[in-house]
Regions:
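Hydrophobic C-terminal alpha-helix "anchor/cap" residues
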Residues: 82, 116-118
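Phosphate/diphosphate-binding loops
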Residues: 112
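Short, surface-exposed charged micro-motifs
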Residues: 33-35, 81
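Conserved ATP-binding/catalytic segment of the ANL
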Residues: 28, 40-102
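Alpha-helix capping and helix-loop boundary segments enriched in small/acidic/polar residues
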Residues: 9, 104-108
Length: 120
C-alpha cells in the first residue's frame, strides 16, 4: 500500500501488505520528512507537508505556483488532509481544496455530500 504524488517522484508513504494497518497508506519513505500541519497530528486532521531529495524543486517557468506550493521552511504543501499516528502511519482523510463551486457561488464539499448520502 502506498501514497504519493508526481511532485514527490512519486512516493511519500509505503507499507508492505503483510504489515498493512487498516485505513493507513503506509509510513513515510526513507529520506523524506513529513509533518501534519495541526496542533495534534495523531488526532487532529491537517495538511500533509513533505520535504526531501525526491521532492520537486518547483514548477517549470511558474515561480508564483512554486512559491505557493512551499512553506517558508521548504516543505511542499501536498493539499492532502490527514493524520499520522505515533508509529508514523499516515492516514489520508480528504483534500484541502476538494470542493465543488455551484452556479450561485456556493462551496459544496464532496465529503459532506457523501456523509449525507451514507446516512440515508
Amino acid at each position: 500500500v502506498g501514497y504519493g504524488m508526481t511532485e514527490c517522484a512519486p512516493l511519500i508513504g509505503y507499507i508492505p501488505w503483510k504489515k498493512f494497518k487498516q485505513g493507513s497508506c503506509g509510513r513515510v519513505v526513507d529520506g523524506l520528512q513529513i509533518r501534519v500541519d495541526s496542533d495534534n497530528p495523531s488526532r487532529e486532521i491537517g495538511e500533509l507537508q513533505v520535504k526531501g531529495q525526491n521532492v520537486m524543486l518547483g514548477y517549470y517557468k511558474n515561480p508564483e505556483a512554486t512559491r505557493n506550493a512551499f512553506t517558508d521552511d521548504g516543505f511542499l504543501r501536498t493539499g492532502d488532509l490527514g493524520t499520522m499516528d505515533r508509529n508514523g502511519n499516515i492516514t489520508i482523510c480528504g483534500r484541502l481544496k476538494n470542493l465543488i463551486l455551484t452556479a450561485n457561488g456556493q462551496n459544496v464539499f464532496p465529503e459532506e455530500v457523501e456523509a449525507m448520502i451514507s446516512a440515508i
